[in-house]
Structure formats: structure tokens, C-alpha cells
Amino acid sequence: MSAYSLSAGQGPAQAHPIESGCMDLPHMGVIRVLGADAVSFLQGQLTQDVALLGQDRAALAAYCNAKGRVQASFIALKRSAEEVLLICSRDSVAPMVKRLSMFVLRAKAKLSDATEEFRMIGLCGSAADALKPGATPWSRMDDGAAMVVFLYPGAGVSRACWLAPAGTPPPTGPELPLAYWHWLSVRSGIAMVGPATFEAFVPQMLNYESVGGVSFKKGCYPGQEVVARSQFRGTIKRRAYLVHAQAPVAVGQEVFDLSDPEQACGLVAAAAPCPDGQGYDAIVSMQTSVAAQGGQLRAAGAQGPSLTLLPLPYPLLEDI
């Protein structure tokens, strides 16, 4: 383990960003899918090719309705040939266990809420780099009893998710406030879908296909035809963009362009206050035509906070 110390309940009081450390992630939960058919069952439910997951790789995945709208998104990792863990918003665990269980039928797979069986910690900066220098996003390693998934960086800061059975000695590092993790997650440009944005987007509206969250080579899953058609026919009209605002913005707020203030052109998918106290950063799923024009953007109405576009930290895949 790296040579830092984590002291529970003693977060720093600094308002400025600290680029290395650890924090518990109590807002995240874990769904366990267990059984001989766990992988094949999920293969028919998620946008990800679960069969390709291995001991060295995790992946972003989404569960969609029949119209291709994302109900929840996950970080999927295979713990064994018969056990897959899905990391998601804690508020999504119960409804997703219930929803997915409806389709198990005769498959040898059982879904359960395993949140209390694990501890999840976010690692930032050198606390993440020390475990595997140069790790690429979605790569995975085992660290004793723990599983570590390396995520997309945020604001140039490396990130990783450490997951281990409850009671496992945690990684060590300066403890950071959870708000810093939320901000880094926003700056990564990847918005996770939970109850607040349930069925608000198809995967491409969040750039999931550009960050490895959609497989176009696997078999069917709910909404697959819509997702594939959007990609192959070039009908992607909305993308996720990073923006900055000087005033608070919130998930679920509509976004408007002052050239057409009566018609929303986007929706806030994720938002967090900047650690330096200078406003908010957010991920907005927005019409590509409006983003290309660089219009005068506002959140929550024409009189709402002004939004300034920021560069995405990853390239977008062109329409196939």
C-alpha cells in the first residue's frame, strides 16, 4: 500500500483543492449478481460486453429501457466466473435489484444488495498512482482482498475506486472531503445515472460510447436497437459537455440558449461546487448544434446562471 494515512471522520478544513488523498464513498452502492449464469444474464441486460471482463479490466455499463433510455449506470467488475459486482448510485441499488430480478426467470443468477458487505474508498492523485503507475481508465488490479478500478481522471488528477470486504484494512492517505470527489467526477466528463436522471438520456447523450460504456459487437439487450440506430445512422443530436457557472447549478435543471429562451436545449446531468469556492462545474447533455454555435447558455431559465463551455477531457467517437 502507499505511505499515507486515512483517519476516519477527520476531513481537512481547507477550501482549496488537494490533489492527493482518499475519501469514503457512502453515496455509492454495490449490487451482487451471483450464480452459474451471472455473466450470461447480464450480457443480455447491459450495454457492456460483460463476457470480456477479466481480472485486469472493469467497465462502464448502463441498463436501458426498451426505448434506449438509461435507467441506471454501473461500474461492472467480475469477481469470479460466477460473481459480478455492479457499483452504482446507492439510491439505484434497490430499484435495480428489483427490476433486473424480474428478468432472471430460469437463469441461475441471483441479485442482491451487497452494499453493507463492502467498503468503498476513492483514491486521488498519487494515492491512486502509487498502486499502478500509468494505469489506464477501466483497468483493474487486486490489492490483497481489495479490488481497485482505475477511473478517468478529473481536472488532470488520477482517480481510482478501492472496493474490499467490510473490515479490510483501508488504503492510507490524507483524508479528503467527499465534495472533492464529486467535483473530480464531474471534471472527468462522465455522469453516472441515478434516480434524479432516470430515463433522461440514451447512452450517447452522455458520451458513454466514447468512454467504453457501450459495445456495438455484442448481442441484444433492452434498448439495443435504439442505441445502435443512433450510432450507425448518425442521429446523435445531443452530447455531454463540461460547463462552468459562477452560481449554483443542480442535477435535473434544464439548460437554455438565449437565442431561443422558450425551448430547453439541454439538461444538467451532474454538478458539483469547485473546491476553490469559485462557482460550480457541471456536465450538461445538450444539443450538439447549440454547443457548436457557442451560444449564451443559462441553467434553469433565461435568468439563471450563465454557463461557459469547458473542453472535454477525452475525444468523442465519430458517428460510425
Regions found by a protein language model. Give the residues of each.
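Short, conserved active-site entrance elements at the starts or edges of catalytic domains
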Residues: 178, 183-210
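Short amphipathic beta-strand starts and helix->beta connectors
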Residues: 12-18, 61-73, 104-107, 141-149, ...
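Acidic, proline/glycine-enriched N-terminal capping motif
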Residues: 1-60, 64-71, 80-81
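Glycine-rich, small/acidic residue-mixed loop/short-helix segments
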Residues: 206-213, 228-320
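Acidic, low-complexity central loop/insert segments
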Residues: 19-23, 27-30, 75-188
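A common structural junction motif
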Residues: 49-50, 101-109, 172-181, 259-264, ...
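Short, conserved charged micro-motifs
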Residues: 37-42, 93-97, 127-132, 166-173, ...
